[in-house]
């Protein structure tokens, strides 16, 4: 059975790059009728926070990427937080030491750093070996460690050989002998390093495919060596391309919003974000761009992942969001849009009126947060607009003639035409002025939609105010 995992660190909000990784894993698991596992990599105790773990889960749920096993739902391969698995890592490290594939190091971190700096100053790569650390392994040092309650670090003996990775996306990647030296797998604080914890977890959780960003490609050499040491076949690796900003540089905060939470707060829809992220580094066999989650699952395959960097285009995401927003049932749209109106200080009293406003304005809106300003004039009188002198009589007469008219465009339009003809006013100039009087804006939805919905009382009141009444 296919088993994949998404393994974020709870050190901040879910970045769109992480969300895309989670999405690709989720789609592959669902397509192959496999399992999608959520694992929390929280061994960086200083930066990891349970609050961020909750936020990460909240963002994944909002996107609709639900996991089969994880810290909150459990499963047969737990615990699913690395901080709760420390004893497991220790046992596996000790096993490697017993088998002569790893060794204890009694050097203090600052001594290791000194060695590193010395190697660099001599123009050598900072590669470590067991011989370099032997001088620190003395009875005195061991006693010191014991008295201080410290554990020796554990270093892995890196075999001197080439390693070949057949990556689903990158193709054949060869790691040459001597690319790295021995490396730490358990620190003296008793916690595992990223690569070691990752391999132990993937082995024990029976992960079959590792789909992740290509910034992890450099970690793969260490991981392949560890799988070999444990005499386990590595999973299938698929390193997906980096997401770049419009300027071709790695996507970061300087490009604007980059977290799922920020996009949600701006009024983006999960359907749109999922659809857009899926197309960053993957393409539909028929080139389709607008795809539901179900369509993404049925058409997803790893062989359509591109090795080329993907460009994050905020305008395309916005366009796509507009499409989903306009095609949403009006009840759901009203439910999602309402908090944005409340935040803008607009109180919704009449639900049916609110839905009609959304129907009229949605063609001009691409994200939920744009609705309040686009439709504020339906709920509040705009500032009075001065009517040009040559049109004041037109508006005065209209105000009188429309008092007793039934409030439909079929009844209103003939009155407009009659009054304009009497005064010899060009329709274009009149309608532009009328729009400003009613909405306080130069552009917006069609007046034929605005006028009936505003109602006679508001229509006449706004003309009265602009005439100085």
Curated annotation (Swiss-Prot):
EC code: 6.1.1.17
GO terms under cellular component: cytosol
GO biological process entries? glutamyl-tRNA aminoacylation
User: Which GO terms fall under molecular function for this chain's record?
Assistant: ATP binding; glutamate-tRNA ligase activity; tRNA binding; zinc ion binding
Quick check: keyword Isomerase in the entry?
Answer: no
Q: Which Gene3D superfamilies match?
A: 1.10.10.350, Glutamate-tRNA synthetase, class I, anticodon-binding domain 1 (1.10.8.70), Glutamyl-trna Synthetase, Domain 2 (1.10.1160.10), Glutamyl-tRNA Synthetase, Domain 3 (3.90.800.10), HUPs (3.40.50.620)
Give the superkingdom in one word: Bacteria
Instruction: Please state where this protein is localized.
Output: Cytoplasm
Motif 'HIGH' region per UniProt: ranges: 8-18
PROSITE patterns documented for this protein: AA_TRNA_LIGASE_I
What positions does the entry give for ATP binding?
Answer: 253
What are the entry keywords? Aminoacyl-tRNA synthetase, ATP-binding, Cytoplasm, Ligase, Nucleotide-binding, Protein biosynthesis
Q: Does the keyword ATP-binding apply?
A: yes
Which reaction(s) are listed as its catalytic activity? tRNA(Glu) + L-glutamate + ATP = L-glutamyl-tRNA(Glu) + AMP + diphosphate
List residues traversing the bilayer.
none
Q: Name one Pfam family in it.
A: tRNA-synt_1c
Task: Identify the HAMAP family for this entry.
Answer: Glu_tRNA_synth_type1
Looking up NCBIfam families in the UniProt record yields: gltX_bact
Family affiliation: Belongs to the class-I aminoacyl-tRNA synthetase family. Glutamate--tRNA ligase type 1 subfamily.
The entry's function note states: Catalyzes the attachment of glutamate to tRNA(Glu) in a two-step reaction: glutamate is first activated by ATP to form Glu-AMP and then transferred to the acceptor end of tRNA(Glu).
Q: How does it assemble?
A: Monomer.
Q: What is this protein called?
A: Glutamate--tRNA ligase 1
Which organism's genome codes for this protein?
Answer: Thermotoga maritima (strain ATCC 43589 / DSM 3109 / JCM 10099 / NBRC 100826 / MSB8)
The gene name reads gltX1
């Amino acid at each position: 059975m296919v088993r994949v995992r998404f393994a974020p660190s709870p050190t901040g909000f879910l970045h769109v790059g992480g969300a895309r990784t989670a999405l690709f894993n989720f789609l592959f698991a669902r397509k192959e009728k496999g399992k999608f596992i959520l694992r929390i990599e929280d061994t960086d105790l200083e930066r990891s926070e349970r609050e961020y773990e909750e936020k990460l889960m909240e963002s994944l749920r909002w996107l609709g990427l639900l996991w089969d096993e994880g810290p909150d739902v459990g499963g047969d391969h737990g615990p699913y937080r690395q901080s709760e698995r420390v004893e497991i890592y220790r046992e596996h490290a000790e096993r490697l030491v017993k088998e002569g594939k790893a060794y204890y190091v009694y050097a203090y971190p600052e001594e290791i750093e000194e060695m590193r700096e010395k190697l660099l100053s001599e123009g050598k790569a900072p590669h470590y070996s067991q011989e370099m650390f032997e001088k620190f392994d003395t009875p005195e040092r061991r006693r010191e460690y014991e008295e201080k309650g410290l554990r020796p670090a554990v270093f892995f003996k890196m075999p001197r050989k080439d390693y070949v990775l057949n990556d689903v996306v990158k193709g054949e990647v060869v790691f040459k002998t001597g690319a790295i030296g021995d490396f730490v797998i358990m620190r003296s604080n008793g916690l595992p390093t990223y690569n070691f914890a990752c391999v132990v977890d993937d082995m024990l959780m029976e992960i079959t495919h590792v789909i992740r960003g290509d910034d992890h490609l450099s970690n793969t050499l260490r991981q392949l060596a560890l799988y070999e040491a444990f005499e386990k076949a590595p999973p299938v690796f698929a390193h997906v391309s980096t997401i770049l900003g419009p300027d071709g540089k790695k996507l970061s905060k300087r490009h604007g919003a980059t977290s799922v939470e920020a996009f949600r707060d701006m009024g983006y829809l999960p359907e749109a974000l999922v659809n857009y992220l899926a197309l960053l580094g993957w393409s539909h066999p028929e080139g389709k761009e607008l795809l539901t989650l179900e369509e993404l699952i049925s058409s997803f395959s790893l062989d359509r992942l591109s090795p080329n960097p993907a460009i994050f285009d905020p305008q395309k995401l916005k366009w796509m969001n507009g499409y989903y927003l306009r095609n949403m049932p009006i009840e759901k749209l009203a439910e999602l849009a309402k908090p944005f109106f409340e935040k803008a200080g607009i109180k919704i009293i009449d639900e049916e009126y609110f839905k009609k406003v959304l129907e009229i304005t949605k063609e001009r809106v691409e994200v939920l947060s744009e609705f309040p300003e686009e439709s504020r004039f339906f709920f509040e009188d705009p500032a009075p607009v001065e009517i040009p002198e040559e049109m004041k009589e037109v508006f005065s007469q209209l105000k009188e003639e429309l008092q007793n008219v039934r409030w439909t465009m079929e009844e209103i339009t003939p009155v407009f035409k009659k009054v304009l003809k009497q005064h010899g006013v060009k329709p274009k100039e009149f309608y532009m002025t009328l729009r400003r009087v009613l909405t306080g804006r130069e552009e917006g939805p069609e007046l034929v939609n605005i006028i009936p919905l505003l109602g006679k009382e508001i229509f006449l009141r706004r003309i009265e105010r602009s005439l100085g009444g």
